[in-house]
Amino acid sequence: MRLFLSLPVLVVVLLMILEGPVPAQGAPEAVDASSGLDKLKEFGNTLENKVREFFSRIKESDIPTKTRNWFSETLQKVKEKLNIES
């Protein structure tokens, strides 16, 4: 049982050793607050435009109507099979 548990641990340790040292991380760039806010605002505007375009495409498509009709027809069939009146 010990051998069964120690083999995976040994493999993980060997992989860590063979991987070598972790590369040094670069110093974070000094970004002033205004450029960070500008990037955030640009991202927000882009996201807003994409979401508006997505919802306008859905409104213009016939998918919601087809889906609503399909659910209505399916519900009607189930009611007929169960003899439920509404």
UniProtKB/Swiss-Prot annotation:
What range does the record give for the signal peptide?
Answer: 1-26
Q: Where in the cell is it found?
A: Secreted
One GO term under biological process is: negative regulation of lipid catabolic process
Which branch of life, at top level? Eukaryota
Query: Which InterPro entries does the UniProt record give?
Result: ApoC-1_sf, ApoC-I
Q: Which Gene3D superfamilies match?
A: Apolipoprotein C-I (4.10.260.30)
Task: List the disulfide bonds in this chain.
Answer: none
Alphabetical keyword list = Lipid transport, Secreted, Signal, Transport, VLDL
> Primary place of residence?
secreted
User: Would you tell me the Gene Ontology cellular component terms?
Assistant: high-density lipoprotein particle; very-low-density lipoprotein particle
Q: Which Pfam families match?
A: ApoC-I
Q: What else is known?
A: Apolipoprotein C-I is present in acidic (APOC1A) and basic (APOC1B) forms in P.paniscus, P.abelii and P.troglodytes and perhaps also in baboons and macaques. The two genes for ApoC-I arose through a duplication process that occurred after the divergence of New World monkeys from the human lineage. In human, the acidic form has become a pseudogene sometime between the divergence of bonobos and chimpanzees from the human lineage and the appearance of the Denisovans. Pseudogenization resulted when the codon for the penultimate amino acid in the signal sequence was changed to a stop codon.
Chain's role: Inhibitor of lipoprotein binding to the low density lipoprotein (LDL) receptor, LDL receptor-related protein, and very low density lipoprotein (VLDL) receptor. Associates with high density lipoproteins (HDL) and the triacylglycerol-rich lipoproteins in the plasma and makes up about 10% of the protein of the VLDL and 2% of that of HDL. Appears to interfere directly with fatty acid uptake and is also the major plasma inhibitor of cholesteryl ester transfer protein (CETP). Binds free fatty acids and reduces their intracellular esterification.
Similarity annotation: Belongs to the apolipoprotein C1 family.
Q: What is this protein called?
A: Apolipoprotein C-I
Annotated source species: Cebus capucinus
Give the classification, highest ranks. Answer: Eukaryota, Metazoa, Chordata, Craniata, Vertebrata
